[in-house]
Regions:
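C-terminal, non-catalytic "cap/extension" segments appended to globular domains
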Residues: 3-139
Length: 139
């Protein structure tokens, strides 16, 4: 729901439109109605739910989710494929925020100054989807 709401808002922004709360209310109600259909009644107050999402107003909030997914996937792959993976993971945890994000990621072999961890994550997700499809075909 949040992604659909944001997609519509950012599309309007990219198209050069300006708008206020009433437009945001309209977009939110439309998204909720599209999602829930006639399963529930969407009243006018439901359109205000976008206001309680403080992270909408925080720059780069979606970046933290993406970075977290990429770094955690890199950590999992390092743990799975490296003889020092478990030790490196413990060292990352022991670092306790004493390093920059780049330095922390490097402990588990994720050089986030390059696109390699992102590409590895995309490949991992692609492989996972392929596995799910293969397992589903066996059912």
């Amino acid at each position: 729901l949040e992604a659909a709401f944001q997609r519509k808002v950012y599309t309007l922004i990219e198209e050069g439109e300006t708008f206020g709360a009433s437009k945001l209310n309209s977009i939110m109600k439309e998204v909720l109605t599209d999602f829930w259909g006639d399963a529930i009644e969407i009243d006018d107050d439901a359109a205000l739910t976008w206001m309680r999402q403080a992270h909408y107003y925080m720059g780069l909030y979606s970046y933290t989710y993406s970075a977290g997914l990429v770094i955690s996937t890199a950590g999992y792959l390092h743990l799975k494929h490296s003889e020092t993976g478990a030790e490196d993971w413990l060292n990352l945890l022991k670092s306790g925020g004493s390093k920059t994000p780049l330095e922390s990621a490097m402990i588990i072999g994720a050089d986030i100054s390059t696109d390699k961890p992102l590409r590895d994550t995309i490949q991992f997700l692609s492989d996972t989807v392929d596995q799910i499809i293969a397992y589903s075909a066996e059912l």
